[in-house]
Curated annotation (Swiss-Prot):
Protein name: Triosephosphate isomerase
InterPro entries recorded: Aldolase_TIM, TIM_sf, TrioseP_Isoase_bac/euk, Triosephosphate_isomerase, Triosephosphate_isomerase_AS
Oligomer and partners: Homodimer.
Classification via SUPFAM superfamilies: Triosephosphate isomerase (TIM)
An annotated Gene Ontology molecular function: triose-phosphate isomerase activity
Organism (species): Vesicomyosocius okutanii subsp. Calyptogena okutanii (strain HA)
GO cellular component: cytosol
Main location: cytoplasm
Biological pathway: Carbohydrate biosynthesis; gluconeogenesis; Carbohydrate degradation; glycolysis; D-glyceraldehyde 3-phosphate from glycerone phosphate: step 1/1
Reaction(s) catalysed by this chain's protein: D-glyceraldehyde 3-phosphate = dihydroxyacetone phosphate
EC number: 5.3.1.1
Compartments, as annotated in UniProt: Cytoplasm
Function noted in UniProt: Involved in the gluconeogenesis. Catalyzes stereospecifically the conversion of dihydroxyacetone phosphate (DHAP) to D-glyceraldehyde-3-phosphate (G3P).
Length: 248
């Protein structure tokens, strides 16, 4: 049975005070939560969050990493820096990194490799734009994104990778993906992995990252191939985030 995972992506939000309040509120409501819960926080707050979560069931993650160990890369953060703050997870290939910072499939695959080689679990984000879906290229785009990773690290590595499907066209656009649309793409992703190794495909958790919220979380996670969510805006509100965690 695959593990249900709820990962919060705070993006470039919060403050020192807000971080303290949000984490404490989440921790206070975790008693009945059975899923694995991860919060991926801005780099400046990682030490603060590490101290707050302690040995609780709340897991710390980062939002990106640089493939280099160190050097003249102003503004970047290495995998060792991330691990210094107790993080065990890192988001890789988020749609905003792909679109705003021009990270292509090869760069994303390299980041996955660096994370795995340094005992961090990558949350590999994949997904298509509106024009891709409208032109019937969803499967083609998603296939290329996954294939780049398989080509570099191999199918067996997916035992240690969490996949997150982001339908970019359904994030902050007012367009909503139906549970069936989400399930169809999740099933396709799993079938692609199965072409290489059926066992790996069955144990790989595939999260949904298309504006999951307390209203649609249960219906989405009732779908056969949806194993949790990568949560954006709703992860900044403790009660909303906890409702999603408990919906699983």
């Amino acid at each position: 049975m695959r593990q249900v995972i709820i990962a919060g992506n705070w993006k470039m939000n919060a403050s020192k005070e807000a971080t303290n309040i949000l984490v404490m509120d989440i921790l206070s409501g975790m008693v009945d939560v059975k899923s694995k819960v991860i919060i991926c926080v801005p780099f400046p707050y990682m030490a603060q969050v590490e101290a707050l979560v302690g040995c609780s069931q709340l897991n710390l993650g980062a939002q990106d990493l640089n493939i280099n160990k160190s050097g003249a890369f102003t503004g970047e953060v290495s995998v060792d820096m991330i691990k210094d703050f107790g993080a065990r997870y890192v988001i890789v290939g988020h749609s905003e990194r792909r679109s705003l910072y021009f990270e292509n499939n090869e760069i994303v695959a390299q980041k996955v490799q660096v994370a795995l080689n340094n005992n961090l679990t990558p949350l590999l984000c994949i997904g298509e734009l509106l024009e891709d879906r409208d032109s019937g290229k969803t499967q083609e785009v998603v296939s290329e994104q996954i294939q780049a990773v398989i080509d570099l690290v191999g199918i067996d590595a997916f035992k240690d990778i969490i996949v997150a499907y982001e339908p970019v066209w359904a994030i902050g656009t007012g367009i909503t993906a139906t549970p069936q649309q989400a399930q169809d793409t999740h099933a396709f992703i799993r079938s692609m992995l199965a072409k290489y190794d059926d066992n790996v495909s069955q144990i790989t958790s595939i999260l949904y990252g298309g504006s999951m919220n307390p209203r649609n979380a249960a219906e989405l996670m009732n779908c056969k191939d949806i194993d949790g969510g990568l949560i954006g805006g709703a992860s900044l509100k403790a009660q909303d985030f906890l409702q999603i965690c408990k919906a699983s």
